[in-house]
Amino acid sequence: MASFLMVLALPHVRQIERATLPNGIRIVTESMPYVRSVSLGVWIGAGSRIERGPENGLSHFLEHMVFKGTKNRSAEDIAKSVDSVGGGLDAFTSKELVSFNTKVMDEHLPLALDILAELVLNPLLREEDLAKEKGVILEEIKMEADQPEFVLHETFISNFWKGHGLGKPILGTRETVKKFGHDMLRDFHARVYSPSNILITAAGNLDHEELVRMIGDKFAGLAAREPLAVDSVPKTHAPLILKKKESLEQVHITMGVPAYRLAHELRYPLYILNTVLGGGMSSRLFQNIREKQGLAYAVYSELNLFSDTGCFSVYAGTAAETAKQVVSSVIHEFRELKQELISEDELRRAKDHLKGSLMLSLESTSSRMSNLARQELYFDKFMTMDDMLESIERVERDEVQAIAQAFFRTEDIALAMLGKLGDMEVTREDLVC
């Protein structure tokens, strides 16, 4: 936002417009005439979810490779182009998306679009860059393997959505990355970076019609293709996995259950439940496990929600001798949320927390740009700030309890533990709630 006064004057008004190019590329913009920046993003429906077996990690690998040079820009030119105007250029890969995005002053929007178009449409993907980038990615995989929380997360997710793309690592594995070839990379780019699989969003001081014209000039030559096949809804599993690593000082614990998809109509009561359980310093997990019992430094709950499924999980790191006590404490909180309504005070705090987080999350052009993509891809409609705030305010205590009762079922709880476990055992009876 341009200033605090502007936030007060235009709290919930969003000037959002949509367009679709003849080849199928979707464009969504939000005009914010009271700012001087523009954030622009190109979103590809890729990630581990759409990768075939040997391709695991290829979305992320390709995201790296496009920065090695394009038809009209070297790797150094790409870096200098945005740096020289004080802007930022970034990219990331998730389970369901790849994003290339930039933020610049409004007068540099043509430059920003030109760079993103080059990255997406004209990467060189040279064979000589392949081996070097494999080395980079393999080191990234090794780095992640040295982080217990990451190892635990991958262990949990790979078993929770076993056999499905959502359960595969975004980076791929050492085995898959080593086998990536030049033809595989080019074929994947041609198949996945297709018009029906591309969304472009922008927010800031921009003119919608002019930007659509500019995007058309850059992307109109990309031929339409058949949409990618939609994969199946993943089946969830509830294993109990204890993975020994004697070199660790702590035992790391993740417990999780299936949750709603991102656009589910009951997502707001679910957000409240997550906030009450482990969404902050005043949450039950933080207060009871850290503050009252002193069993953990890090303890929280989180939601990982996707287009057709989700996971509601709890993480804690604790000493080996208190690991089972932490598991019991988490189960106790599950049980309490099922048996008793949350207090009016908890409900009020959770609502205010969500409202504040929502308002703060939409202050910048970059966050607005990302929000446009999220709403277009997952909700297929645009909700006003008032819509979202009112949805939060409408949540009742019995709705939160009903979700706890539906989700926190003993037979559905998956568990993964990593650390100095000795002869520790955890059975399904330990998870009765």
Language-model segment annotations:
Residues 240:
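Flexible, small-/acidic-enriched active-site or ligand-binding loops
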Residues 4, 14, 20, 31, ...:
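Charge-rich, well-structured scaffold segments of protease-associated domains
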Residues 1-10:
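N-terminal amphipathic/basic-hydrophobic helices that include classical n-h-c signal peptides
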Residues 34, 39-103, 279-295, 306:
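M16/MPP (pitrilysin/insulinase) zinc-metallopeptidase core fold and M16-derived inactive scaffolds
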Residues 53, 57, 111, 132, ...:
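A generic structural signal for residues located within well-ordered alpha-helices
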